[in-house]
UniProtKB/Swiss-Prot annotation:
InterPro entries: KsgA/Erm, rRNA_Ade_diMease-like_C, rRNA_Ade_Mease_Trfase_CS, rRNA_Ade_methylase_Trfase_N, rRNA_adenine_dimethylase, SAM-dependent_MTases_sf. SMART domains: rADc (SM00650). It is an enzyme of class 2 (transferase). Keywords: Cytoplasm, Methyltransferase, RNA-binding, rRNA processing, S-adenosyl-L-methionine, Transferase. This is Ribosomal RNA small subunit methyltransferase A. It comes from the Bacteria. It catalyses: adenosine(1518)/adenosine(1519) in 16S rRNA + 4 S-adenosyl-L-methionine = N(6)-dimethyladenosine(1518)/N(6)-dimethyladenosine(1519) in 16S rRNA + 4 S-adenosyl-L-homocysteine + 4 H(+). Belongs to the class I-like SAM-binding methyltransferase superfamily. rRNA adenine N(6)-methyltransferase family. RsmA subfamily. GO terms for cellular component: cytosol. It is found in: Cytoplasm. Specifically dimethylates two adjacent adenosines (A1518 and A1519) in the loop of a conserved hairpin near the 3'-end of 16S rRNA in the 30S particle. May play a critical role in biogenesis of 30S subunits. Gene3D superfamilies: Ribosomal RNA adenine dimethylase-like, domain 2 (1.10.8.100), Vaccinia Virus protein VP39 (3.40.50.150). Its EC number is 2.1.1.182.
Length: 296
């Protein structure tokens, strides 16, 4: 029997009725019902028959189905147990799809890649990410040093703009720095609310993040570097000096030391965090080695 694509209002509604499925707001469930949007996502992903895909939050399989037609293998993580029988049904025609009923934030992703995707020449994360945990998912995947070549992911427009933001813009912040430290970022397309069931409260964006061969700057302790950059944006209207001063209010550090540190790195203490490029933050971090009393 021929079925319509899952990513159509007719088929999605039929599946909802068939399984008596009710959306869980707590899981941020919004199913894509526009095949053209999905084709745009797949085109941006440069998928071929040697590509392995990691998908997060497949739902009923609207994106999964189209990925399975283009990629060598698809490994989809779905946290909602209620969707597992639905996916078993909708993915039956595709023997290259593996559905894993786990929370992506708790799963041993390296193990699953070894188990399912080792024969793939390239690995991409392609997903309509759950909006309530988009940032933790991306940071978790990037910071694990997994053999992932890139990401083409849909998310809340505001978050996507922060990932892709340039220095000096309103959206630029600590998330921009982490994303651009590991990847080259670009916007693929803006997605209206109307192509989801149910429609979300916000507009969406598809962002492409391709892994850099090496990070954009040379840092010896990434966690400490990211803590330092995050602190610079703790209160956006404050200067970088004031934000760093507020970290050391216990009095153990002489305020003059922070000024010395900023000036040694060539950073005007009156600047705000959003005006510093990643390279300037790297210079600031590397200068920390000479100021051991400043501990992040």
């Amino acid at each position: 029997m021929d079925y319509k694509d899952i990513a159509t209002p007719t088929r999605t509604k039929a599946l909802l009725n068939q399984y008596g499925f009710n959306f869980k707001k707590s899981l941020g469930q919004n199913f894509l019902i526009d095949v053209n949007i999905i084709h745009n996502i797949i085109d941006a992903s440069d998928i071929d028959e040697q590509t392995g895909i990691i998908e997060v939050g497949p739902g009923m399989g609207s994106l999964t189905e189209q990925l399975a037609k283009s990629a060598k293998k698809v490994m989809a993580f779905e946290i909602d147990q209620r969707l597992i029988p639905v996916l078993k049904d909708t993915m039956r025609p595709y023997d290259n799809v593996t559905v894993i009923n786990e929370d992506i934030l708790k799963a041993d992703i390296a193990h699953y890649i070894t188990e399912h995707l080792t024969d793939c020449e390239k690995i991409m994360v392609v997903a309509n990410l759950p909006y309530y945990i988009t940032t933790p998912i991306l940071l978790n995947l990037m910071q694990q040093k997994l053999p992932i070549d890139g990401y083409v992911v849909m998310m809340q427009k505001e978050v996507g703009e922060r990932l892709n933001a340039q220095v000096g813009t309103k959206a630029y912040g600590s998330l921009s720095i982490v994303a651009q430290y590991y990847t080259e970022t670009s916007k693929v397309l803006t997605v209206p609310k109307s192509v989801f069931l149910p429609p979300p409260n916000v507009d969406s964006i598809v962002v492409k993040l391709m892994k850099r061969p090496t990070p954009i700057v040379d840092i010896d302790d990434e966690n400490k570097f990211f803590k330092m950059t995050k602190a610079a944006f703790s209160q956006r209207r404050k200067t970088i000096n004031n934000n760093y001063q507020s970290l050391f209010v216990n009095g153990k550090v002489n305020k003059e030391k922070i000024l010395e540190w900023l000036e040694a790195a060539g950073i005007d203490p009156r600047r705000r965090g959003e005006t510093l490029s990643i390279k300037e933050f790297a210079n600031l971090y590397n200068e920390l080695q000479n100021f051991t009393e400043l501990e992040f």
